Amino acid sequence: MKPFVVFVLGGPGAGKGTQCERIVQKYGYTHLSAGDLLRDERKKPDSQYGELIESYIRDGRIVPVEITISLLQRAMEQTMALDGNKHKFLIDGFPRNEDNLQGWERTMNGKADVSFVLFFDCDNETCIERCLERGKSSGRSDDNRESLEKRIQTYLQSTRPIIDLYEKTGKVKKVDASKSVDEVFTKVQDIFDREG
């Protein structure tokens, strides 16, 4: 069976991870965060990609698409090998730019079905405040204002155009992510009850 994929996009701090946890609990999806996979990979002492990933993340740049897709593909294959019923995936924080999207279409065409794009729309200042708050406890090296402003610029220049592209195909489901966690999840449930 082919993986059934929902791409989850939104700026840093839009609440993607929090909402994905709830979707997993309620709808049985497997959550794959492109960022978490990259962060885990760079910590592995024997990783062929570790140092490269580290330098990209530190500079707030987008990691080369081949690396990210190979990690996503491996994670989906491992999940499905362990449990044949687990074929629904939330892919969070990918595709981040046109190169990502083309790489996905080149590599995964016919191997996975993208059902829709869940887009958490949130103003930049709210996103920054949330990330600074999270940075106090998360220990993430990129949760500081300077890094965040770079990440938001990257997001606006690179990821927003992807959302616009998907909007033309009618695949984008947009949620106002500036509301409380519960209010946002109510909207998310409406979408998943209809779509998948």
UniProtKB/Swiss-Prot annotation:
Gene3D superfamilies: P-loop containing nucleotide triphosphate hydrolases. Binds 1 Mg(2+) ion per monomer. Residues 133-143 are annotated as: LID. Catalyzes the phosphorylation of pyrimidine nucleoside monophosphates at the expense of ATP. Plays an important role in de novo pyrimidine nucleotide biosynthesis. Has preference for UMP and CMP as phosphate acceptors. Also displays broad nucleoside diphosphate kinase activity. Monomer. Belongs to the adenylate kinase family. UMP-CMP kinase subfamily. This is UMP-CMP kinase. It comes from Xenopus tropicalis (Western clawed frog). The lineage of its organism: Eukaryota, Metazoa, Chordata, Craniata, Vertebrata.
